[in-house]
Design a protein with these regions (language model features):
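Proline-rich intrinsically disordered, low-complexity coils
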Residues: 12-14, 25, 70, 104, ...
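Low-complexity, serine/threonine/proline-enriched polar segments
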Residues: 26-127
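Intrinsically disordered, low-complexity regions enriched in Ser/Pro/Gly/Gln/His and often acidic
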Residues: 20-21, 54, 101, 112, ...
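Acidic, proline/glycine-rich low-complexity IDRs
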Residues: 1, 118-161
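Short, extreme N-terminal segment that most often corresponds to the first beta-strand
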Residues: 1-35, 149-161
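Weak global preference for isoleucine
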Residues: 5-8, 13, 39, 48, ...
Length: 161
């Protein structure tokens, strides 16, 4: 399976300064990805358009900058929140013996995994912030993005898992 890492900054990123696979932290390859490669300039535009489409009507991409509307969080997380609530409800009914591991339960494991993934998809898209040299799941980045300012997309990196 494949997904994309988007280099996103609140400052323009020059083409010759775009992130490469070498900028990605070791933990990412230890726990998420088994390989990655930079995306060509032609495919980069397609990937940025795919990101804008994924973010929906609460995002605009004008070819230079990405703008997020104040409604981005309300719109983007609607579907995931339904799964989160369903998993939380299932977990709320868990007996202590299952929670402690004394009684194995595949249903419990799946609900716990589903709740975590609905909050932040470990195998989804990522954002690399060159200003702080950190990598975040897209979900985490959206939760903390400042919607009052534009964002610029530098490199795009394909990763597989």
């Amino acid at each position: 399976m494949h997904n994309t890492i988007y280099e996103i900054s609140d400052k323009p990123i020059p083409k010759n300064g775009r992130a490469t696979v070498g900028n990605l932290p070791a933990w990412f390859f230890d726990s998420v990805s088994d390989g990655a490669c930079e995306i060509s300039d032609d495919d980069r535009e397609q990937e940025i358009n795919r990101l804008a489409h994924c973010l929906g009507s609460s995002c605009t991409w004008d070819g230079k900058k990405l703008m997020l509307s104040p409604e981005i969080r309300q719109e983007y997380f609607k579907g995931a929140f339904k799964y989160f609530k369903k998993a939380a409800s299932a977990l709320a009914e868990t007996e202590y013996a299952v929670f402690s591991g004394a009684v194995p339960s595949v249903a419990f494991d799946l609900a716990l995994q589903g709740m975590a993934e609905s909050y932040s998809d470990r195998f989804g898209a990522y954002v690399y912030d060159p200003g702080i040299e950190e990598l975040f799941p897209l979900d985490t980045w959206i939760r903390s993005a400042d919607v009052s300012k534009p964002y610029y997309v530098g490199g795009a990196i394909d990763y597989h898992y």
